[in-house]
Amino acid sequence: MSNLGKVIQIIGPIIDIKFDSENLPDLFNALEINAGDRKVIAEVEQHIGDDTIRAIAMEDTEGLKRGMEALDTGKSVSVPVGKEVLGRLFNVLGKPIDGAGEFISEESYPIHRPAPSFEEQSVEPEIFETGIKVIDLLAPYQKGGKIGLFGGAGVGKTVLIQELINNIAKEHGGLSVFTGVGERTREGNDLYYEMKESGVLEKTALVFGQMNEPPGARMRVALTGLTMSEYFRDQGQDVLLFIDNIFRFTQAGSEVSALLGRIPSAVGYQPTLATEMGALQERITSTKNGSITSVQAVYVPADDLTDPAPATTFAHLDATTVLSRSITELGIYPAVDPLESSSRMLDPRIIGEEHYEVAIKVKNILERYRELQDIIAILGIDELSEEDKLVVGRARKIQRFLSQPFTVAEQFTGMQGKYVPIKETVRGFKEILEGKHDNIPESAFLFQGTIEDVLKKAQQMEI
């Protein structure tokens, strides 16, 4: 027998509905409100008194009015999962929004699910090879880890994300789920068509809850993407989950919290900030079956890293990849800052002594070069000691060797993309540090894959 209630109050996206006190819907249950020509889905957030619930709408509340009937579905919002979701674009409710025809899925999962238990989780730290030299060498990713991607507008976040999707699909046979949380619709549109052109779309599912949507949708869309990822992980796959932008998840939660009448916490954020973030992040993990590696773009409000939203996010991250405008100005891409980026995987017990030593030496030489730049700017390079001149020469080669042509950018750069295994990356930088390539001009190191590519380029330059 269907459990029906009546809408008694609507304040923006918040809807109060009266049910029979014997049949009050459970928290997080999905409700269907019949608004004539369409059904509006809302989620139960609070019980008020004996017979009234307060729900947050997942869709626009335009056209709703008091007295309308609301049906308790008896379960939380469920979204389609399985290989059918690949190559398609969904909203928070798992409905396709790409206009690419009918969609039929055999299975669906509820978006509210428990995190894997301790017994199910994999505890062995394992490197996730990206094939991108600067990341693999200096700030390696953990399989099943969480990575924060920091960078302003136009420094190459999207291209880096696309290259990661491309590399996991082609080199590891892995899948990706891209979740757009509260970002610009135009950017999502661009990403969709760029992915289509570069051929990575069929290995990716996209879920969008953009900034024009109600706060309920923006708060839950990250869970929709995560649920699709969990299915693939449980099937033994390695999945890449992109969340762009994790700050908007917190922001939407703050809006919902205020609308529900909760007393705000520090800087006006919701009092449940850490709990909400933990509930999402704890589900992103490796199990004995497969892994979910998450790359999360992090917007830092007013560049204040102590703001509660980014500060709460930091507690969960295993690695940070910082994209820097000063590096894009040098014409070096990917514009990853080798000194600002960090990873807890940079440990000799995990990556091995050789890799660790090479990474630390590369960081040291780049740090020394940064210190010398002021002297060079004032006095010129000729005033440096012979030892410092050698350091500068090698640092400039290392800086250029950290650049790399990307497969997804081939149509723009005209250069063939390169995937570089970690062993080759470590060997290449070790040889530069040992001075084996001191005689090669630094321009030969720019946009090359392995050290062999550099030697080939140097030979061509001599001809």
From Swiss-Prot:
The lineage of its organism: Bacteria, Bacillati, Bacillota, Clostridia, Eubacteriales. It is found in: Cell membrane. Pfam families: ATP-synt_ab, ATP-synt_ab_N, ATP-synt_VA_C. It comes from Clostridium botulinum (strain Hall / ATCC 3502 / NCTC 13319 / Type A). This is ATP synthase subunit beta. It catalyses: ATP + H2O + 4 H(+)(in) = ADP + phosphate + 5 H(+)(out). Belongs to the ATPase alpha/beta chains family. The gene is atpD. Its EC number is 7.1.2.2. ATP binds at residues 151-158. Its main location: membrane. It comes from the Bacteria.
